[in-house]
């Protein structure tokens, strides 16, 4: 830009010099015309006064001829100076137009630079928001993973308790069968001895009480198994929900990664455009 201004100043100086030369040529032309007019008047006077003196007439004719040649040269110089002035005016106009275009390109580049800076700021803010969201999602995912581990642990514990209760029920059923067998043996001996019948009856009552006790325990175990089954079902439901949440979070993370990649590509394109604009400014 500074070089263009210096070039314009030099062109303006050349224009002023050309104008001065043109004015000087005009002055020479006028002087030559005046001299020519004066010589013509003198020639006419001499022709009237010295008609017989051909040498003098020829001398003055040569002077007139020289004056006319000088006049033609002055006219030619004036014409050349005017042409040079016109050429300089055209060059100045072209330089001014080039300067206007350069200023327009500079303004456009500055505007693009400002827009690129704004876009970069917006992209940076967007990336910070995305990073915060990703961080929150990671924390949420970690919490849900802990809940999933806890649910799996509860389910495993419920399975273990269920197996333990099932084993106890098998043992109780075996004891009940053995008690029933003993009761049958006692009943078979009932017809032989009344005394043994009483003993057997008492034993039977004791066995019945024990059977009732076992029945109460069995009901209790069944109720506990039912509760454990409900807890297991609830744990399985929580595990399924946690798995769905993890899948949803994985999809959200994938979407966020895609969005971050798109923002990076957009920022890269803006940077390239900004570099091109700066190169255009530098080339000016």
UniProtKB/Swiss-Prot annotation:
InterPro entries: Tropomyosin. Pfam families: Tropomyosin (PF00261). The keyword Cytoplasm applies. One of its GO terms (biological process) is actin filament organization. Binds to actin filaments in muscle and non-muscle cells. Plays a central role, in association with the troponin complex, in the calcium dependent regulation of vertebrate striated muscle contraction. Smooth muscle contraction is regulated by interaction with caldesmon. In non-muscle cells is implicated in stabilizing cytoskeleton actin filaments. The molecule is in a coiled coil structure that is formed by 2 polypeptide chains. The sequence exhibits a prominent seven-residues periodicity. Homodimer. Heterodimer of an alpha (TPM1, TPM3 or TPM4) and a beta (TPM2) chain. This is Tropomyosin beta chain. The gene is TPM2.
